[in-house]
A protein has these predicted regions:
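Polar, enzyme-active/binding microenvironments
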Residues: 1-235
Length: 235
């Protein structure tokens, strides 16, 4: 596990270690805890693990997903974390959730509008959004994080794609890159949805990226490197 400080540029520093070596997991957080979910340490598993963001150290076991999967999308409100879609090894429509400041197994939340993996999640304090995904739809689902239920289709990406990175400032969500290598960045307002609009281009086409943000800017980390972008505008 590495970390960076948003207000300064520079290389990532060592934070600690996951419970085991793994790939194709996802993660989300509130201001205190980060939770990493699923993945593949040799076979697809259901492990959830957490860290306390303010202090470096190794991850601790949190509990288990309702269904073992990888390539899922995680998002959160200040109190609840949701995990959407993934591969089981077939594409999954499962949504499950946890309460971030407790530990324990995930609980069923509902279903996406279609089974898919490698979508791009973003969230506000009330809504989680899952955009795109494999096998290649452009549709964008949302859920209301505080109440269980199925995903609702409320818009489309400007270009159908998957395996990009999502980041947000709790008002606007941005979606950057995709498989196969793309430099597309588009955005939408989380509260209203609709068709995503062009935001700008990445410095290089990249895929399998992950995005993070504070309230001012975001970082998109993919196969071709890391680039900051100001979420509130375009660029």
């Amino acid at each position: 596990i590495d970390y960076i400080t948003f207000s300064t540029e520079g290389n990532a520093a060592d934070f600690g270690n996951l419970l085991a070596t793994r790939e194709t997991l996802d993660g989300s957080s509130n201001s205190i805890r980060g939770i990493f979910t699923g993945g593949n340490p040799g076979s697809i598993d259901n492990v959830m693990q957490y860290i306390t963001i303010a202090s470096t150290g190794n991850a601790t076991d949190f509990g288990n997903l309702t269904v073992a999967r990888q390539n899922l999308g995680s998002a959160s409100s200040p109190t609840r974390q949701v995990n959407m879609g993934g591969v089981t090894p077939s594409a999954s429509n499962v949504i499950d959730f946890t309460e971030i400041m407790t530990t324990g197994n995930a609980v069923d939340f509902g279903d996406l509008t279609a089974a898919r993996s490698n979508g791009m999640p973003v969230s506000s304090s009330t809504r989680a959004v899952y955009a795109g995904g494999d096998p290649g739809p452009s549709n964008v689902d949302f859920i209301t994080i505080a109440s269980q239920g199925n995903g609702i289709d409320y818009g489309d990406l400007s270009v159908a794609r998957y395996a990009g990175g999502g980041a947000d400032n709790s008002v606007k969500g941005v979606f950057a890159g995709s498989y196969p290598n793309s430099n597309t960045i588009d955005s939408l307002i989380i509260a209203t949805g609709g068709t995503a609009t062009d935001f700008g281009d990445m410095t290089a086409a990249r895929e399998k990226a992950k995005g993070v943000s504070n309230s001012h800017g975001g970082l998109n980390d993919g196969y071709q490197g890391t680039r900051p972008l100001p979420i509130g505008g375009t660029g």
